[in-house]
């Protein structure tokens, strides 16, 4: 059964609300949880089900970071002579016009693939899904499409602008809208679908002929009255990473062991795979004080780290205090610096005795290689206050 399925993963355009982290990389390749990237979750979901033909469809964002991370796909068992992993540009160019060369290349991939059915995921939605069970339920339903959703509480605080779905008594999707923070509880779409390749190509071709091409979720919503869509309820942890705030929330949530076990498949056995880098163990010196934090290999810690995430190669000097921070790869936090609710992107230096603080709702982001100092921080705060 699985051999008849391929997977499509939409990587998501670089959302404006998360732009400080996507200036130099695709949204799907943003580091999370210390040693992982956002794309790892979608890729692992499909390969854990045995799918071995995966197409990644991206917008017009920078792809160097993504291609460096994925490589030939060996970590996900996708480095293969037949099938494997492929990266494509979407059919819209920078001016949002249909690009004929991209259309031809993308369609060739679908026609060349021998699988007759498709699992579609979107990388900005993070979860650990039993794709095998999803496929089984889809085939048992006899419907054209199966759409995955989750009953979400506090939908008035999270999942802004995510798709919401209305489901009738026969478990059929009868409405697709958008979550605008009006309801406390909502059925949120995971932007995950199962359908036949024939139906997907029909939706794509019809949209191209109409000059209204967009991602599959919007094509399905546009054609909802003529489609028979089964609803599949997902009950695990779900995070939509479409803003800096939600990115920060996800990292902080990973400090909760119950959530961490769910997302990384500790009990289910559905592991999350990532690119492995050979680095030495982290060195905790005598003055180090680390509490409730995720620390990757290759770090050197002399200061205090509380409720924080540290990626590979971070150096935390003596008398540093980090509280609720996300420190990405190869950052150097110098002696006496105090940071709270701060995201520090790769290759940054925070100078001695710097004091950087923000709120959990609006964490401060130090962009890649900025070598931040107090004057820059004060100028930013003055700008925000006077705006």
Descriptions of predicted regions:
Residues 1-11, 198, 207-387:
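Left-handed beta-helix
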């Amino acid at each position: 059964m699985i051999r008849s399925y391929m997977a499509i993963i939409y990587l998501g355009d670089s959302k404006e609300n998360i732009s400080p982290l996507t200036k130099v990389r695709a949204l799907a390749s943003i580091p999370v949880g210390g040693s992982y990237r956002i794309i790892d979750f979608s890729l692992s979901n499909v390969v854990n089900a045995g799918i071995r033909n995966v197409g990644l469809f991206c917008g017009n964002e920078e792809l160097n970071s993504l291609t460096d991370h994925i490589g030939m796909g060996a970590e996900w068992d996708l480095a293969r002579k037949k099938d494997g992993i492929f990266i494509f540009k979407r059919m819209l160019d920078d001016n949002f016009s249909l690009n004929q060369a991209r259309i031809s290349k993308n369609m060739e991939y679908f026609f060349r693939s021998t699988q007759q059915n498709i699992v579609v995921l979107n990388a900005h939605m993070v979860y650990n899904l039993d794709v095998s069970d999803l496929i089984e339920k889809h085939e048992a339903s006899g419907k054209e499409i199966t759409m995955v959703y989750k009953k979400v509480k506090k939908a008035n605080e999270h999942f802004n602008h995510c798709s919401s779905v209305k489901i009738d008594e026969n478990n059929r999707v009868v409405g697709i809208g958008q979550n605008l923070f009006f309801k406390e509880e909502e059925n949120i779409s995971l932007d995950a679908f199962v359908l036949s390749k024939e139906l997907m190509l029909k939706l794509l071709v019809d949209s191209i002929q109409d000059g209204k091409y967009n991602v599959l979720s919007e094509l399905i919503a546009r054609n909802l009255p003529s489609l028979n869509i089964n609803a599949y309820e997902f009950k695990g942890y779900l995070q939509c990473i479409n803003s800096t705030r939600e990115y920060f929330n996800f990292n902080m949530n990973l400090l909760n062991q119950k959530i961490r076990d769910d997302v990384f498949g500790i009990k289910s056995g559905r592991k999350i795979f990532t690119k492995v880098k050979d680095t030495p163990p982290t060195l905790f010196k005598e003055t180090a004080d680390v509490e409730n934090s995720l620390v990757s290999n290759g770090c050197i810690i002399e200061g205090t780290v509380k409720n924080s995430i540290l990626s590979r190669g971070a150096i935390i000097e003596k008398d540093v205090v980090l509280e609720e921070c996300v420190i990405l790869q190869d950052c150097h936090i110098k002696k006496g610096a105090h940071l709270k609710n701060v995201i520090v992107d790769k290759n940054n230096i925070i100078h001695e005795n710097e004091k950087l603080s923000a709120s959990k709702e609006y964490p401060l982001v130090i962009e890649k290689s900025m070598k931040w100092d107090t004057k820059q921080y004060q100028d930013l705060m003055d700008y925000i206050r006077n705006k």
